[in-house]
Amino acid sequence: GDKLNKNSLAQLHVNFNTLPALLKNIVASKLNGELSVLNDQDAFASLAYNYSKDKVLLTGTTIVNNSDNYYNLFADLQAQKISIQNMLPANTASYTIFAIDSYLPWKKKLNNWMAAKKEDKKTTQLIENINTKYHLNLDDILPRYFKNQMVTFQLSSTEKIGAINLSNGDKLTQLLIDLSNDYNEEIKSLNEAGILYAYFGRPFENFKKPFYTIIDNYMVFANNAATLEAFLSSYKNNQLLISTPSYISASNQLPGNANISFYVDHANSAGLIQKNIYLPYYKHLQSEEGLKKYGSFTYQLSGDGGKFQTNILINKQADILQKDSLAL
């Protein structure tokens, strides 16, 4: 089964333990923002390398070595149809999406992950304290109306935002009233810290006591209200990532199902990358020999009995593709 197809040029083996050390020579700080997905991954990938004039595609298998790694909560799940990217603004620089099949079985895995970090008792206590203080049962609120996908994303203007999709946003809005303060008609803030982390884990660790808005069966949150106002403006005006040529081009070349999906838009993240990468490397990345012609980077992981089926796509810019095809 390891035979390469005719277009494959090579077999690539990536030890993600050595990757952060390698990238620290290039990156001016700890891997964060769009590169944080490569931090602490403790994984090994075996990938077939497929190169054409419009893309580099790597396909194969990733094994996450550390059983306490957050990614392993997804390694034996069924791949899900990813749709939460439909609400992302056009100026999204990068995103990471996580998709599960069913919350309650997954929550057991999350509890084990918390226990391995020695955070389970603290989290249980937090929920009990909130339940007592507000005379409610948090387990009947977020878990009940969470559908199956969560996302964190960063805008070209550096703001970081998180979101989950919902089965009934109106109902959740009502149930969160006692736990919330009104900032304005659309934007609220959570009164208690740590709720999102308790129910979803690592992606929402930095959204401790966020502002949030619920719109069209999405709960969207950020650490300041102005970020959500900017999000709502993009969303209501249909200025969306899924309408951009670069995103359309990349998504057309990949399966729509995954459990973890990571995306970087080259143009939208150029300013963020410049702040994070030493200047000589940045100049090379932006050169013709570097990544200048490429529009996006996508990294998809789909659960497969404890390991991940993997797709990595580095896709050429859509306008360059059009020029190339006109020249044919």
Language model: regions and residue ranges:
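Single conserved position on a long alpha-helix in the C-terminal lobe of the eukaryotic protein kinase
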Residues: 1-2, 96, 142-250
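Leucine-rich, highly hydrophobic segment in Treponema pallidum outer-membrane-associated proteins
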Residues: 1-110, 248-328
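Short secondary-structure junctions and interdomain/linker hinges
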Residues: 7, 81-84, 103, 117-121, ...
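Extended amphipathic, helix-rich lipid-handling scaffolds
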Residues: 14-15, 19, 123-140, 268
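Intrinsic, low-complexity N-terminal interaction/targeting segments
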Residues: 23-27, 32, 134, 140-144, ...
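Short, charged N-terminal helix-start/capping segments
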Residues: 78-100, 131-155
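Alpha-helix boundary/N-cap detector
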Residues: 118-125, 129, 133, 170, ...
